[in-house]
Amino acid sequence: MTSPVENSTSTEKLTLAEKVWRDHVVSKGENGEPDLLYIDLQLLHEVTSPQAFDGLRMTGRKLRHPELHLATEDHNVPTEGIKTGSLLEINDKISRLQVSTLRDNCEEFGVRLHPMGDVRQGIVHTVGPQLGATQPGMTIVCGDSHTSTHGAFGSMAFGIGTSEVEHVMATQTLPLKPFKTMAIEVTGELQPGVSSKDLILAIIAKIGTGGGQGYVLEYRGEAIRKMSMDARMTMCNMSIEAGARAGMIAPDQTTFDYVEGREMAPKGADWDEAVAYWKTLPTDEGATFDKVVEIDGSALTPFITWGTNPGQGLPLGESVPSPEDFTNDNDKAAAEKALQYMDLVPGTPLRDIKIDTVFLGSCTNARIEDLQIAADILKGHKIADGMRMMVVPSSTWIKQEAEALGLDKIFTDAGAEWRTAGCSMCLGMNPDQLKPGERSASTSNRNFEGRQGPGGRTHLVSPAVAAATAIRGTLSSPADI
């Protein structure tokens, strides 16, 4: 699906992001005008696509390239009681209408759809990679901010608004000004028990939730190179939490091995040609980034959030901060507000914070590697008295893979709920929600006020910390078990 242009043989020293951008410019903007960028793949779901389809109808336009669109049902679908994928299995009327509308739109406009009940259904940012639709060097968009997940493959992937979704439907292009580039250089190697989730939370705490605004982040260094694709997807997924437009990791053999043989991946001679192009994508030696940030990966320990934005995080071994710990007045005010909402007392050890619900799910951390990590910790244990643990695989495919490995039994034997695929408790948009005042340890990506339900309090954690927390009942790491 990539569309490199003739100037891809340029000798100019370029970053990964600059190469992908260059190879997709249909027309170059002049006098400060945006470039017109070709889009290789648009992903769709039931929440942000209905208005775009309606826009096509009202203007009498056709979907320019149905084959470059891929849809699934994820945001509003229930994660229990789903057996056939029938609309009757959705109790909420609005959710049922949204899913029904997506099905009708995809049928009318010829878009490939993976609905509930289909083994290939799941969260849109898991479905693309598992099908091989997500490939290095592509431009990928979706009406969802966590489209940045796909940047783990060396693609430029970013979320867009509904009007832009319609623009891509009609033209397969977007007018955009080039993004700035930022290198996140991770030195050293991650210690055992420290994951990509801990790393990305530490990065966001370091640069802030606005530190990446206007940038494409490229994650670099030996620690990144040694990560699996599942771990890399976690890194890129949360780039938006640092304010970035996208996050990217250069493709390598790990990437190629993941993509090869998947349903929508190139085959035969096309595969060889694709890999040859993909190998040209990594940032050139001597290329210049607009900004460089360094972080010592070897010094990291399990990392969690204590507040109400992903940048309010600390190592698990620390204590709840005081507003007086912050020198910036805005940070001080934000800390005061967050502590009040989270009902936390400064000086309280983070490990003493009692948790009501553990959520292992979302497009951030519910792939097979995440489930395996959590299951290995839970095996032979029971979750704490009064604890609720929900395990929601990010796709039906992954659910079946986990069941073949016996992971579902480990979770249910421990007392956890084993659910069907969907966005679930990541966002308070479906039946899976916290009650007011309840506190969760969640492997998702956002801890805003009310994100998991009105009045709910969210701590972002890794799958390992989630599992350990479920056992002990307070925020914990596997070392505490």
Curated annotation (Swiss-Prot):
GO terms for molecular function: 3-isopropylmalate dehydratase activity; 4 iron, 4 sulfur cluster binding; metal ion binding. Binds 1 [4Fe-4S] cluster per subunit. GO terms for biological process: L-leucine biosynthetic process. CDD domains: IPMI (cd01583). Residues 432-459 are annotated as: Disordered. Keywords: 4Fe-4S, Amino-acid biosynthesis, Branched-chain amino acid biosynthesis, Iron, Iron-sulfur, Leucine biosynthesis, Lyase, Metal-binding. It is an enzyme of class 4 (lyase). SUPFAM superfamilies: Aconitase iron-sulfur domain. Its cofactor is [4Fe-4S] cluster. It holds the Pfam family Aconitase. The keyword Methyltransferase does not apply. Its EC number is 4.2.1.33. It catalyses: (2R,3S)-3-isopropylmalate = (2S)-2-isopropylmalate. Induction: Repressed by RipA. [4Fe-4S] cluster binds at residues 363, 423, 426. Pathway: Amino-acid biosynthesis; L-leucine biosynthesis; L-leucine from 3-methyl-2-oxobutanoate: step 2/4. Belongs to the aconitase/IPM isomerase family. LeuC type 1 subfamily. Catalyzes the isomerization between 2-isopropylmalate and 3-isopropylmalate, via the formation of 2-isopropylmaleate. Heterodimer of LeuC and LeuD. This is 3-isopropylmalate dehydratase large subunit. It comes from Corynebacterium glutamicum (strain ATCC 13032 / DSM 20300 / JCM 1318 / BCRC 11384 / CCUG 27702 / LMG 3730 / NBRC 12168 / NCIMB 10025 / NRRL B-2784 / 534).
